[in-house]
Regions:
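Short S/T/G/P-rich N-terminal loop/turn motif that feeds into the first structured element of a domain
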Residues: 1-53, 59-70, 93-96
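C-terminal structural segments of small proteins and small subunits
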Residues: 62-90
Length: 96
């Protein structure tokens, strides 16, 4: 079964609230087998809308990544991100 990538592009508008999101989300992602590959590092924007924070996490499968997003723990995290950020998130299955 191929692994999956969780790719988020984020503009933070409230650092205090977003830091609560990040702490809880980090735990939820780990609980579902996710590991961070990139998290807020340097980047070059080539196309589309610029977001200054970019995050990539790898999960064991598309199902695991989706289960993480739908989990109560991650939804708790999202309650802190709403109103504290503008976000785009896509989950993509990796090519085998």
């Amino acid at each position: 079964m191929p692994s999956a990538l969780w790719i988020a592009h984020v503009t933070v508008t409230d650092e205090a609230a977003y830091s609560k999101y990040a702490a809880i989300a980090t735990e939820a992602i780990a609980e579902h087998g996710g590991v961070f590959l990139a998290r807020g590092g340097r980047y070059v924007q080539k196309e589309g809308r610029d977001h200054p924070r970019n995050v990539v996490a790898r999960f064991p499968s598309l199902d695991a990544a989706n289960a993480c997003y739908e989990s109560a723990r991650y939804q708790e995290a999202l309650s802190h991100a709403r109103g504290a950020s503008e976000r785009d998130l896509v989950i993509v299955e990796e090519y085998e």
